[in-house]
Amino acid sequence: SGAALRKYNEKLAILDFSEWIAPTLVTTNPDLILIFLGQYQDIIVKPLDGMGGREIFRLHKADPNLGSILETVMHYGTRTIMAQKYIPDIKKGDKRILIIDGQVVPYTMARIAKKGETRANLAAGGTANIMPLTEKEYDLATELAPTLLTNGVFLAGLDMIGPYLTEINVTSPMGFQEISKGSDC
């Protein structure tokens, strides 16, 4: 529904399902990002309003460009960003799971990053592989589906890296064509 599209920030919606997410921080304060980075050593930062892999950065404690990257992604402290512990399973793909009217599509599109790239988004040069959902992916999707439906979300694309939910896409849950062509759905 239109109200659900306005209510759901695709990045923040995962916070309602904290048992399924990697350690996460949402802030406008670069000092808190540095503390979070000190705790986890390897993190991803991204704007709340981004899409297609734009302005997503992987940060390491010793990165000499750390200050510049944070200034850029945080627009000099005027933009709220999300930081998440880096999930090494990204090498196996960032998986898109579709939920349509509360029903879980039993296949996923795994977006694999191109060599030398952290972002697996197709817009960033990633490739797509279609495969059946794992039991864990199916369990996550079936747990979230009723809550999404109750909140007026009839179409959603859940993004997972390894065992972690990373995003709930409601405005452009891509993957229909790829999953339809690559499966028996």
Regions found by a protein language model. Give the residues of each.
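A structural signal for short, well-ordered beta-strand segments and their strand-loop junctions
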Residues: S1, V26, I44-K46, M82, ...
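Conserved N-proximal alpha/beta basic substrate-recognition cap immediately N-terminal to
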Residues: S1-L32
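Short glycine-enriched loops at secondary-structure junctions
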Residues: G2-R6, R111-A113, I161-Y164
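Short, charged, surface-exposed secondary-structure boundary motifs
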Residues: Y8-K11, I56, E117, I168
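Short, hinge-like loop/turn segments at secondary-structure boundaries
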Residues: I14-E19, I43, A62-D63
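Phosphate-binding site of ATP-dependent enzymes
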Residues: P30-D31, G38-D42, L48-L140
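ATP-dependent carboxylate activation and anion-phosphoryl transfer catalytic cores
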Residues: K115-G116, N129-C185
